[in-house]
A protein has these predicted regions:
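Exported/periplasmic ABC-transporter solute-binding proteins
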Residues: 25-67, 71-79, 83-87, 121, ...
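Bacterial N-terminal signal peptides
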Residues: 12-22
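Short, glycine-/small- and polar/acidic-enriched structural segments
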Residues: 113-120, 125
């Protein structure tokens, strides 16, 4: 049984691609210097640190395809990445796990800039625990209790769990994962006062791997590509929790991990007949260019066929390349490419 989940034309990438093709020669600036083109030049882009593995793969592929193009990424927590994009026209694009706010759009319009916001993929927020933690099946309601500090001890969820104090860990105090948990899991409620942040995603994984009572939150793209040796190393150190949206009466089949197929089902969650992974978010490439420069070219690449297939191979859900789900013997949907 197959399901066609992703519709083409959802991001407007075709319009961006047409704009790129329309540029047949290099332009010159007022000073007479050659300007960058969609496939050549040297630019800076800001990238949410949570998305580093997948966007680094896109940059490598883009520069391999266009040797005259140099895309210099600055990886930073979401708040810093977007602030840098807003503050300087030297940062052409920002890659983030949200659209710009109405206030941010208005600020750019004061600068006579109309940002182009292109949806490129769906990522998830994975929940990781120590391998010895017996509670790796969690409902979203239980997760909210842990995040709010209402269940400060693991024994509050399971009397047989002797791991003691629950320690919430994020990759950065200004990261998109922390914001997502606050906005989408806690619905604006404050995080537990005991929550803390490491400096990097690698440090977060290492902390959870060495502290049995810890529970961490990390972008799925850090653990989704099992062809990557680093990812396989991470997965040997921690356990990825399976989640359900059910509040009571859940069976083991209702709990799902952030596999690509379960993230894809999130897109049709209103109609989905199977459990879907609940902690998902859409990724955007946002450009401030007023012409067809290298920033537009890179955004077009990420939203185009080659860029979308990079997301697909890495275990994320591309925005425009259709993903078919094939029912497997164990009744768990698997992506067919």
């Amino acid at each position: 049984m197959t399901f066609s989940l992703i519709r083409r034309g959802a991001t407007g990438s075709a319009a961006v691609a047409a704009l790129v093709v329309a540029v047949a020669c290099q332009e010159r600036g007022k000073d007479g210097k050659l300007l960058d083109t969609p496939t050549s030049g040297n630019i800076r882009v800001a990238v949410d640190e949570t998305l580093r593995p997948i966007i680094a793969a896109h940059i490598d592929s883009f520069q391999g395809l266009y040797p005259a193009a140099k895309v210099r990424p600055t990886y930073a927590p979401e708040a810093e990445a977007i602030a840098g994009f807003m503050a300087s026209d030297s940062v052409r694009d920002v890659v983030a796990a949200r659209r710009l706010t109405t206030e941010e759009e208005a600020e750019l319009q004061k600068q006579h800039i109309i940002p182009v916001q292109t949806r490129v993929a769906i990522d998830g927020v994975a929940v990781i625990v120590h391998p010895t933690n017996p509670d790796s099946l969690l409902s979203v309601a239980q997760l909210a209790e842990l995040c709010a500090g209402k269940a400060p001890e693991w024994s509050r969820l399971n009397a047989e769990n002797k791991l003691g104090t629950v320690t919430l860990v994020f990759d950065n105090s200004a990261s998109s994962t922390r914001r997502y948990v606050r906005d989408s899991v806690l619905r604006g409620e404050a995080l537990a006062s005991t929550a803390f942040a490491t400096k990097t995603n690698e440090e977060l994984i290492e902390y959870v791997a060495t502290h049995p009572g810890a529970i961490g939150f990390i972008g799925v793209n850090w653990i989704s590509d099992e062809d990557d040796a680093a990812v396989r190393g991470f997965l040997k150190k921690v356990r990825v929790a399976a989640l359900t949206t059910k509040r009571g009466g859940a069976t083991p089949r209702d709990f799902v991990k952030p596999y690509q197929a379960n993230v894809a089902l999130w897109r049709i969650r209103q109609k989905a007949e199977q459990p879907y992974y609940p902690l998902c978010r859409e990724l955007y490439v946002i450009s401030r260019e007023g012409r067809a420069g290298l920033g537009t070219g890179f955004a077009s690449f990420v939203a185009g066929d080659k860029g979308q297939r990079i997301f697909l191979k890495a275990g994320l859900v591309p925005a425009t390349v259709p993903v078919r789900l094939v029912q497997t013997a164990d009744d768990r949907p698997a992506p067919a490419q």
